[in-house]
Amino acid sequence: MMNIRVRRTATLVMLLLAALPAFARNAAAPQQPIAVQMYTLRNAGSLDQQLKIVHDAGVRAVETVGTQNVSAQALKQLLDRYAIKAVSSHVPLTELRNNLDGVVAFNRAIGNTTLVVPYLDQKDRPTDAAGWTALGQDLGRIARQLRGKGMQLAYHNHDFELADFEGRTGLELLFAAAGPELQTELDLAWVARAGLDPAAMLGKFSGRLFAVHAKDNAPKGQAEDEGGFAAVGQGVLDWNAILPAAAAANVKWYIVEHDQPRDPGKVIQTGADYLREHLTLSQPARARR
């Protein structure tokens, strides 16, 4: 009987030892810098269900939409449940101007240190070069305040910031006036919709790219029920040019987004899978570190 128990124990130990290398490889495998913008999942059930979709897609980072309509404690508990971290949060400009301390406190509680201006209401959109310069100065002031609190500020574009003012876009004027503290979150699909080259635009903001919104545009006349957007790699954007340009510009995060997805879970899975494959191929230097 003793010999049988010894043999069983030895066999179990050998099986465990054999499994350890594979487990260690999986545990040690670094997560690529891929996140999901939670706006994509706004119609995909409860917040718990939305985060489960992110987790099941193999993604471990999100960009939140404000407070996600829950307390900081509740949000942190849900993030921890799915081993997901918040890497940034979209916060309306009015909140940053009028409730900065409250915004900072909430985001500290969930472990996030990057706040992003997501959109400008019509009344806040400059109409000339001087207006974009003034807005940049205002955002630079807020960015410096946040830097003193251990946080950073970024700005997310649509297409209206890319109007031309005597050879420079509104976005370029804004960043020139803001100073180095302000980072950009470049939405690649909106850059393309403005008639500009996303790869070239990445080069203009090299060193100031907190993130890109990784999204795609469907061919003209297609996916009209989805706002004309497509899952990453399934549309018309030239990712073979974009991803090397993003790597050269030192993009920190690739945030999967789709404004009007018919199937949010599928869009996220498709986008994450595409980036996992192609980031490895386009960023050999990063992969070797």
What are the residue ranges of the model-derived segments?
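Bacterial N-terminal signal peptides that target proteins for export
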Residues: 2-11
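Bacterial N-terminal signal peptides
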Residues: 10-21
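A cross-domain feature marking catalytic cores of carbohydrate-active enzymes
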Residues: 36-40, 64-66, 88-93, 117-119, ...
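Conserved, mostly hydrophobic/aromatic
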Residues: 36, 54, 62, 79, ...
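N-terminal pre-domain/capping segments
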Residues: 23-114, 207, 281-289
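Acidic/histidine-rich catalytic cores of soluble enzymes
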Residues: 148-236
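Acidic-and-aromatic substrate-binding clefts and catalytic sites of carbohydrate-active enzymes
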Residues: 41-46, 61-74, 92-100, 123-126, ...
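Active-site acidic/histidine proton-transfer and metal-coordination neighborhood
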Residues: 93-183, 265
